[in-house]
């Protein structure tokens, strides 16, 4: 009865396949997390946040439709 | 129509202090609605600017879409205020006035109040939003007439400079607002002005930022029922 020996080339292909599958899994996880919508605040949470926020002292450069007062420090120039 | 609009608006005794606009007969009260009429939330802060406004800036809401009944238009005003306050964090609805598809004028911040609708113009302009998406469709006649009447009223009362300049939002900001069709319309109105470099602001000929925002979050609690629509 011939002895079954592990073929080095077969072992190499199996290792490569595992590596590629792991890479693919990582890519999928990253893509999913990037595309996942950030949890939206409920209306009550929005109202609470707004209530706690001080008034905007100067709105002369504001555009309420396109800009956010919450991100005012990061607005584009 | 403009003269009639002036008379009707004058009959209401428009007040800078946003009093209930129930003066005059039923027809008069149908023209201009106060903040309390549409159920506005109180502003966090109010800051005024001096003198008649030298600019009138026209906007479209894009969303909410056009409304044709007064209760729906009241809700649209509340939705816009919710978006500007709760989601964007500003002190109040950014516009001075809103115009509904019902032909009514809805008081936003009002005259001589610094707005939040057009950077660098907020302390010298009246911002008027025509509720709806006017990129490809022209607003109905009653909306256009109401906007013209409001401007004429502002001039008559001294809130708007008689030599005012009429602008579209896209002329002062990189945006599609007030929509191509409406912008084409106001371009033919009296006092429409092309801004050039000599005035310090370049006009935008190719806006690249669509005027799009998500629908305001659905309320967890029902609003108190809006006041009955004014008799027309």
Swiss-Prot record, chain B:
EC assignment: 3.5.1.28
InterPro entries: Amidase/PGRP_sf, Amidase_domain, Peptidoglycan_recognition, PGRP, PGRP_domain_met/bac
UniProt superkingdom: Eukaryota
Induction info: Strongly up-regulated by PGN from B.subtilis. Regulated by the imd/Relish pathway.
Class in the EC hierarchy, top level: hydrolase
Signal peptide bounds: 1-15
GO cellular component: extracellular region
Tissue-specificity statement: Widely expressed.
Covalent S-S links between cysteines: 67-73
GO function terms (MF aspect): N-acetylmuramoyl-L-alanine amidase activity; peptidoglycan binding; zinc ion binding
Pfam families: Amidase_2
A Gene Ontology biological process term: peptidoglycan catabolic process
Reaction(s) this enzyme catalyzes, per UniProt: Hydrolyzes the link between N-acetylmuramoyl residues and L-amino acid residues in certain cell-wall glycopeptides
PANTHER family assigned: PEPTIDOGLYCAN RECOGNITION PROTEIN, PEPTIDOGLYCAN-RECOGNITION PROTEIN LB
Similarity-based family: Belongs to the N-acetylmuramoyl-L-alanine amidase 2 family.
Protein name as it appears in the record: Peptidoglycan-recognition protein LB
Native source species: Drosophila melanogaster
Gene it is expressed from: PGRP-LB
